[in-house]
């Protein structure tokens, strides 16, 4: 049964239903600040460098609702240069995680719960969508509407990703990132985020841990989008990957305006009987979001901030992961984040940005 609860994204509905009919029961009032913005992010004036990360706002209806709710730096859900289906429903399951989801805990399967809690402060969830897209034939014009929906002191970021196609070369894959980003700019995006925490066509690994792939994607994308601000979205680098992180950051610092960290932590998801919880081939593992990954997001922000200070890099940092309370926003800022974004909390608590702003007054 569908409830009257306000939801930016309803996990009890399919992705396509959310795309076609969401968001749900959102207050029609406009809570945007009327005063002059006092802060900046990527050179743009913003009321508060806080918003919604890529993932749960698939249309301009969703991004415009987020802007009205006072989120000032909002990501349009990651899109591709061609049509791509969503993973089967369900995509978002509540998880049974007590405290931090440490690397040690990730060795074992994570158990999915049967019901979402009323108090989402400690909620963690699966994020298993597969980066669906209806292609630029649909999203290009809708992105124009989304960009226009940003008020004074607000910024719309467009997230894009390359698509692996059968028989394609690595070069063609890397160029597809640039093509998708160029389409976003042509539609009016003032900042583009490329999702690098995705599979690499050249290997079995993830792009953001492959230095050559990251460098090529950044070079080609920056050449394609010119003066438009380029953001890269990365996953968590384990302590033993610190040298890899330093190498990659050093290579791309001249191309990127910001680094967003983190996307998710990857874990094996099972039901209470130990069986695969998410239906379908290739879905034994899923990205995990929510309260339990905050430690990893904070750790990455601190390390990126330390690298920036030590080497004189100019990139800004977007802190993402487990931002569930106003105190989490402040913790990320104290760690070195220039902007903070949430994804899980705003789904169930559309007025979360207002709570963050209220806590700062």
Where is each model-derived feature located?
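N-terminal capping/small domains of soluble enzymes
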Residues: 1-156, 161-166, 356
């Amino acid at each position: 049964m569908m409830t009257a609860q306000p939801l930016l994204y309803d996990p009890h509905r399919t992705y396509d239903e959310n795309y076609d009919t969401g968001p749900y029961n959102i207050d029609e009032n406009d809570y945007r600040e009327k005063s002059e913005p006092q802060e900046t992010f990527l050179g743009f004036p913003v009321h508060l460098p806080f918003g919604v990360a890529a993932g749960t706002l698939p249309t301009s209806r969703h991004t415009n609702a987020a802007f009205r709710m006072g989120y000032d730096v909002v990501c349009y859900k990651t899109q591709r240069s061609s049509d791509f289906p969503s993973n089967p429903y369900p995509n978002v399951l509540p998880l049974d995680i007590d405290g931090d989801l440490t690397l040690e805990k990730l060795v074992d399967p994570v158990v999915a719960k049967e019901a979402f809690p009323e108090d989402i402060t400690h909620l963690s969830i699966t994020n298993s969508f597969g980066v669906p897209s209806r292609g630029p034939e649909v999203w290009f014009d809708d992105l124009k509407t989304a960009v226009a929906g940003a008020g004074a002191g607000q910024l719309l970021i467009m997230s894009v990703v390359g698509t692996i196609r059968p028989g394609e070369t690595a070069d063609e894959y890397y160029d597809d990132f640039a093509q998708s980003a160029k389409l976003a700019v042509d539609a009016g995006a003032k900042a583009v985020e490329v999702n690098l925490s995705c599979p690499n066509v050249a290997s079995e690994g993830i792009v953001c841990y492959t230095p050559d792939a990251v460098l090529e994607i950044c070079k080609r994308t920056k050449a394609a989008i010119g003066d438009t601000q380029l953001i890269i979205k990365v996953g968590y680098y384990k302590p033993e990957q610190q040298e890899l992180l330093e190498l990659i950051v050093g290579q791309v610092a001249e191309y990127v305006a910001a680094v967003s960290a983190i996307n998710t932590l990857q874990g094996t998801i099972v039901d209470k009987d130990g069986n695969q919880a998410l239906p379908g081939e290739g879905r034994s593992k899923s990205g995990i979001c929510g309260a339990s990954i905050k430690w990893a997001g904070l750790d990455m922000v601190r390390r990126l901030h330390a690298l920036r200070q030590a080497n004189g890099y100019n990139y800004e940092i977007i802190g993402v992961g487990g931002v569930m309370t106003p105190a989490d926003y402040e913790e990320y800022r104290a760690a070195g984040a220039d902007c903070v974004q949430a994804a899980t909390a705003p789904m169930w608590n559309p007025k979360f940005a207002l709570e963050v702003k209220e806590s700062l007054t």
